[in-house]
Every structure is written in C-alpha cells, then in structure tokens.
C-alpha cells in the first residue's frame, strides 16, 4: 500500500509517518530528504525536480508498503494517481507556528541568535510558513492543498492536527487495515 501524509509545515506529517513506520511494516520516506541537498546549515539548496523525482520514485518502488510525508503538490501530476491513501493533517496556525519556532530553536540552538545568515534563513522560513492560510499566497497554502486533494485519485483522510499522536496513529492504522481487508 502506498500512503501520503501531507499538510502545512509544522502540522505533524513527519511525526505521524515515523510513528506509523514504528508500528507497521511500512517504510517511511520524507520528501525533505529528496527536496534539499545535504548542507550545513540544512535546507539551503534545492535538488532539481527531475533529480528528486528520480530518486524518490526509485525508493518508492522498492517497497510494497511505503508512507511518504510532505507536500508533493509541485512534484508533478504523476504523483496524483500513485497513492492508495492520502492523509491531510490540518493544524491551526497559532499552534503550528509555535511548533515551528520551537523546532527552529532546537535545530539551530545558539546560532539562531548569533549567526546572521541563520537568523535571516529562519525568519524567511517562518514568514513563508505563516502565509499558509492566506488564500492569496502563491506558495504552499491551505487553498492549494484543498484544490490538490480534489485531483488525487485515492481516498483522502482528513485529520485534526490537535489530536494526540496515539489517536492519530490509531485512526490511520484503522483506515489502512480497513482498506487492506476490503
């Protein structure tokens, strides 16, 4: 079974995918590992679309049961028909931005306060992420995700990001089991 978990940055897609991987035979692939070159600090340089698609497809096809976390809206139309289940996590903006700020502090530590380049990069990322619910925003947004869901050729399960991880995991595993037995 092929599953996608997507939502805004900080909504919990990677956390949920890792938890499902821990409790099943699913292999977790995170789109950030294919989207960004390995740099220090991280998330500085994008991998070209054709290259990232090639590597993700190769890994995706290796496994019978795979769960991908991350937004794939801009990865190409072929990804719209490849999943058996898509899970959309929505979390209110205030909570999501709090999580992202905490993640930035954990990722960069003191450098977040002392390194001007990291400060600029982090601020730009947080400003970008804060636009998610703006209907006029041209980047990754709730509006774009809602429209993209309509184009997916699979069931879409919507999950409230405020649910505790255990409950989200149980909800997804129940859905996967129901699909596997039907």
Predicted regions and their residues:
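Hydrophobic anchor at the beta1->P-loop junction of P-loop NTPases
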Residues: 5
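Conserved substrate/cofactor phosphate-moiety recognition/catalytic segment
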Residues: 18, 22-61
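NTP-dependent small-molecule kinase module
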Residues: 127-182
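Glycine-rich phosphate-binding loop used to anchor ATP phosphates in small-molecule kinases
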Residues: 49-94
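ATP-binding Walker
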Residues: 11
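A glycine- and Lys/Arg-enriched "phosphate-lid" helix/loop adjacent to the NTP-binding pocket
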Residues: 90-140
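Walker A/P-loop
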Residues: 14
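P-loop (Walker A) phosphate-binding loop of NTP-binding proteins
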Residues: 8
